[in-house]
Structures are given as C-alpha cells and as structure tokens.
C-alpha cells in the first residue's frame, strides 16, 4: 500500500515555505544588483557577445563545443588505447577542467588564451583508462549560471527538442536552454556526439543540465573525485561530475575517477573511502538479487515535503509520480520525510559560493596571466581588466561575495549562511539511517528504522526555460537562481546526488528528471538504485 503522506505531498504543489525560498533568492539578487549599481560597472559587449565562438571551424548547431581535439596526439597515453576500462569510449570535457596544451577558458574572456601545461587528475585517469577525449565544451563563465547563457561563446542550445529530430528549432521562442553551468557537456551527450562527458557541479551544474536534456548526471560525494585541475569557483562546494545517457555508463566512469589524489588536499582519505565501501557493500548485499522481481525490497526512500515549493510547475508532477510508483513496484518503501532547513538553503548557498568566488577569482588581475587592459594606468588597470574581461554574472557574484565578507556584513550574511549550511547537514543526517563515513560523530546519524536510505525529489522546478525567456533583457537573476532551489541542499551537505530522466512533460514534451540523494560515500548505492529506476521507467 502506498504511503498516503507521500502522495498528498506530490499532488499538492506549494508549501508554506515557498515564499521564504523566493525571498531568499530575491535578496541575493537585490544585494548584488545594488552593489553593481553603486560601482557603475559596465559590461564589454565585444568581450561578451552572444555570437562569437571559437570551435576550430567546426559547425556545431548547439554551440556546445569550444574546441575539437579529436586528432590531438595527447588524447591518451602510450598503450592506453589498446587496454583500459574505457577503451573506445568517447568523451568531452567542460572548459573549466584542465587539458594539457588545449584551451581551458572557463568560457571567459579573462582566460581566452590560457592553455594549461598539465592535465587535471580526472583527465589523467580517463586517459589511463583508454578514453578517446574529443571535445572541450561550452559552459557558463567560471561555472556560474543555471542556463548556460553566461558565456563568451554564446548560449548552448538544448538538443532534446520534442519537435525536431534533425537539430535546433532556430526559434528563440521555442528553443530551450541546455541548463547550466555544464550545458555544453550535457548537449554533446544528448546529441550523441560522445558517450559521456565531464562537468563540474557546485550547486547543481551537472544535475540541472542532465534534467533539462533528459540524460543522467552524477554529482559525486565531495572529495571522492579529485578537484586538482578544476578551475576553482567555490572550493568547499566544487565537484567533478559525469554525464551520460545511462546510469550504467555513469557508474563505470565514476569507478575510474573515484580515486584518492595526493595533489588534492580535499580528497577523501583511504580510511574514509574504505569505511564508505563497507557501508555500501552491506546495504546492497542486504537487497534481493538484481534478477529479482523486486530488487529494491527493503530499501527505504524518503520524499521531502519541502521540495514542492510554489515555483514547482504542475507538469513536473506526473513524471515524478511515475518515478515514485516505479520505485514501489521495485519493492522500495517510499515515505514522506522533512528537511526543514531547505527554504533557507538557496540564499545560504549563494552567499557562501559567492564569498569563495570573490577570493578565488581575485587572482585574475591581468598582471601574472589572463586578459589585460593596457590602456588604463597603474592601479586602474586592475579594475579595467576585470570589468572588461569578466561577464555580468561573474562580476555580480564577486561583488556579492566581497560584500558578505566585509566586517559590517560578515555576521549578518556569511556567518548566518554558514549556520544554515550546518543545519542543512544535520537535516540530512537526521533523515538518513546510513552512517556518514567521513565523520566520527555518530550523533548526526539516524540509527533507527524511521530513517531512509535514499532521498528522492524532482530535479528542477520546471522543464528547460526557453532561450527567449532566459535571455530577455533585464531578466532578474532571481528567476535563474530559483532553478537551483532543489539542487543546492545536497551541495551544501557534500552528499552524492544522481539525476535520472523520468520521461517527458505531457504538455510541452520536454524532459523531466528526478534526483536521488544518499549519505556521503554512498554513490554506488545511488547508482545501484538509479540503474533499476531507469530500466523501470524506460528512459
């Protein structure tokens, strides 16, 4: 018998906390806009044109590819092409992940000529496994955005059109965004140009594009996949994620990437990895065989009531209900849970991530490397360089973060956001009955039968926005920020999250996704559940 509380929750769209969510997002936007106005910054139309790309002359109807490196001699190390778990697998890499001797621009004019002299650890592992790396993909500038429209190369178009099998609609009123910030990586996977792609996920930048494009996207547990060679946006939140058409493919790639890395000080220790592996093995071994008619019997899945704010469009609900029904048919017990700090998570995320970005991006001064404006004298060159080379969204977040760290604002903004983050982490720990292998504090772990193993929620509040709506002049950032409202809590908690396609919306035909979340280090649990769910849904 289905849990009535869960079904009441997903039938009734809206909650008493939704207004709070909206106010939080608006406050971030208003604060940043006010700072921009006071500083009278102007964007450079030449540096941030929506028509300019450099794609080595290759026609790319989705504007997803920055560079084609298929013929590169550095595609894979000697011998890797003939062996390895990923032999013959084609891949694309987001342009904020370093690839030796190839442009790593972060889709920014600031790094338009930057070519690293080393591979990111994730890229090195892919090469060693025999991967054929073909493309560098477009993204929101420095990973900041939810629509992949904040790019020096222009917006990425969504290949998942239900009305055209041959390419983009070429109509801004109908054409949709691919999601951000890893929209280019999602687009090349959806278009069938590569088997999988790497993206980065700070607050939803892999999961949101996966949902909008109708593919699978994994944000790993923080620290499981090395960040060495990933251009920093927000160090305490950044992760390297995987996008592919199937959970099975994501699982294989993740197993290659999930390695301890001495280059990365935030890389999870071998001890924590071993403890997590033991937990995963215990949980999965307690489930029936995959050949069973109910392979998830005994699994408890929680649906948080706070994940249905008024911003959630009703067309998202039918595919979500099908996912709930699918899990129940697979034997899982689905129950309603509460994550009470969710309404405050969005504003906390934007304050914390912007504060970290303001520090990380201070290094781009036009002196040591990066874009430089020679016309301005002395210290004015610093301001002129950053004003010209950074896009509007990046400048806005730098200013918001800088303000939040000032002596006058620190207590009211950054400190409060950090407290909210701790509350979000406690909420997840209380809801999940699996021990957190990254901490020795068992007080934050639910040990009784009321806890759940996995959490399920809609991936996004709606299907992909149209390009016309997303790029409308004067469109407030709050509308874009709210797209992250369902993805940022798992990021603040450092937990793994897997976006799985759940089918198409009945009215507009565009993809809808659902997301599975579990305890830190339980990525394999999500992948195990996700494989069965994707098969059950036929997506």
From Swiss-Prot:
TM region(s), chain numbering: none
Entry keyword annotation includes Nucleotide-binding: yes
Known EC number: 6.3.5.7
Active-site residues, Swiss-Prot/TrEMBL: 94 (charge relay system), 181 (charge relay system), 205 (acyl-ester intermediate)
Gene3D superfamilies in alphabetical order: Amidase signature (AS) domain
GO cellular component: glutamyl-tRNA(Gln) amidotransferase complex; mitochondrion
Keywords: ATP-binding, Ligase, Mitochondrion, Nucleotide-binding, Protein biosynthesis
Subcellular location: Mitochondrion
Gene Ontology MF: a single term: ATP binding
InterPro entries documented for this protein: Amidase, Amidase_dom, AS_sf, GatA
A Pfam family it matches: Amidase
Top EC category: ligase
Catalysed reactions, semicolon-separated: L-glutamyl-tRNA(Gln) + L-glutamine + ATP + H2O = L-glutaminyl-tRNA(Gln) + L-glutamate + ADP + phosphate + H(+)
Family assignment from sequence similarity: Belongs to the amidase family. GatA subfamily.
Assembly, per entry: Subunit of the heterotrimeric GatCAB amidotransferase (AdT) complex, composed of A, B and C subunits.
Function statement: Allows the formation of correctly charged Gln-tRNA(Gln) through the transamidation of misacylated Glu-tRNA(Gln) in the mitochondria. The reaction takes place in the presence of glutamine and ATP through an activated gamma-phospho-Glu-tRNA(Gln).
Protein's name according to its UniProt entry: Glutamyl-tRNA(Gln) amidotransferase subunit A, mitochondrial
Lineage: Eukaryota, Fungi, Dikarya, Basidiomycota, Ustilaginomycotina
